[in-house]
Amino acid sequence: MRTILVVDDDAWVRGLARDVLAREGYRVLEASDGQDAIRVSAEHPGPLHLLLTDVMMPGMNGCDLAAGLSALLPGLKVMFMSAYDRDFLVARGLNPVGPVITKPFTIEYLTRRVQMVLGDRRAAAPVATAAPAR
């Protein structure tokens, strides 16, 4: 079973991602910010396969978190979530190294993107666009 660490300061987004990804058969760990994510990853006994993190959070941003965890956990795949597009983030000095899904997104879009990043064969059909999940 693959393990995904979901990091977002919005409890609703974390809960949605947790529920959706758990239904898809993933083990899901949660953290509310970068420091919490480092603690959770250190306490988790098994491998982490994917970091799914918000980009803009209080304290440590998702880009710095991804760089830090990737240095500690070689082979960790990273996917970012943001209410802003990549151009907006880069203009503010944030450069997510990895795919960015724009919030809000559909449940199907989140699932397919995670499957694609993890190389899961279930992700055969492409998803054209993100759309509101609320």
Predicted regions and their residues:
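Active-site residues of response regulator receiver
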Residues: 54, 82
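Charged docking surfaces used in two-component/phosphorelay signaling
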Residues: 15-23
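Short hydrophobic/Thr-rich beta-strand motif most characteristic of the beta2 strand and flanking loop
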Residues: 25-32, 40
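C-terminal output helix
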Residues: 105-118, 122
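Receiver (REC) domain active-site loop signature in two-component systems and cognate sites
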Residues: 57
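Acidic catalytic/metal-coordinating carboxylates
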Residues: 32-36, 61-65
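Active-site beta3 strand of CheY-like receiver
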Residues: 45-52
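Conserved acidic carboxylate
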Residues: 8
